[in-house]
Structures are given as structure tokens and as C-alpha cells.
Regions:
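Absolute protein N-terminus
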Residues: 1-2, 127
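Vicinal oxygen chelate
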Residues: 3-11, 32, 43-46, 66-127
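Core segments of cupin and vicinal oxygen chelate
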Residues: 9-52
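A short, acidic/glycine-rich surface segment
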Residues: 29-31, 60-65
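Short, charged/polar surface micro-motifs in flexible loops or helix N-caps
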Residues: 49-52, 60-61, 83-86
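Residue-level recognition of conserved beta-strand positions in structured domain cores
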Residues: 55-57, 127
Length: 127
């Protein structure tokens, strides 16, 4: 068994897709426009390996209050396979104002930096 895809709601599908392309070399599929659910659009974004992302949007989505801990998914972690790449992505994120925590070794042995996507979702980048 494996995870096929992970779905993410967004208020700005173009910004979210561009983020995944820019930071993780995501390859975006065609825009799907639902004929059954007015306003619903989505795009799949494939990464080099692992599950794909389904980026979805509806005009009536409500913003979510961002808190550190809440019930539900806490974050997504992506292994880029190289400490140097973690450093490069963290530097880019710092310049763009989305770096949440700089690169560091965690107590459980991971080299990681933490960034936020355009909607404020937490993404760990590990080496």
C-alpha cells in the first residue's frame, strides 16, 4: 500500500502551483474545471518521486486560522536528499519571506529547514 496523492485546498491555485514548481521542480498537469461543482478547479502536481499533490480551489473557501498545534495534519515533510539543497532552499525562502525556521539538526537526527507555502501551510525540507 502507498499514498497515491495528497490534496490541498488553496484560495490561489496559480500561486500554490507556482510555489511547488519553483521550490520542488513540480510538474503541473492541466487545469481541471468541474462541470458538476461550479467554481471547483484543481491541478495535479507531480514531484520527482512519491505521491502527487492535488491542488484544489473553490471561490467560497474560508481562510483558516494558522496555529502551531491543532487537530489534523501538522505538516508535510519533503526529503530533497542533500543538506546543501536544504541550505539553498532555505536561503531562497528567507529572501522571499517564507522561512519559518532556518536549517538545523533536529534531536531525532534530521537536517531540516521549515518554510511556509503561499497559504501558510508548514513544509519541512529535509536533507
Amino acid at each position: 500500500m502507498k499514498i497515491a496523492h495528497v490534496a490541498l485546498w488553496t484560495r490561489d491555485i496559480d500561486a500554490q502551483v507556482a510555489f511547488w514548481q519553483r521550490y520542488f521542480n513540480g510538474v503541473a498537469g492541466e487545469l481541471y474545471v468541474s462541470k458538476n461543482r461550479p467554481g471547483f478547479v484543481s491541478r495535479f502536481v507531480s514531484l520527482a518521486s512519491g505521491p502527487t499533490l492535488e491542488i484544489m480551489s473553490l471561490p467560497e473557501l474560508l481562510p483558516t486560522e494558522q496555529t502551531n498545534e491543532r487537530v489534523g495534519w501538522a505538516h508535510i515533510a519533503l526529503s530533497v536528499g542533500d543538506e546543501g539543497l536544504v541550505d539553498q532552499l532555505a536561503q531562497r525562502a528567507q529572501q522571499e519571506g517564507i522561512l519559518q525556521a532556518p536549517p538545523r539538526w533536529t534531536g531525532d537526527g534530521f537536517y531540516e529547514a521549515i518554510i511556509r507555502d503561499p497559504d501558510g501551510n508548514t513544509i519541512e525540507i529535509t536533507g
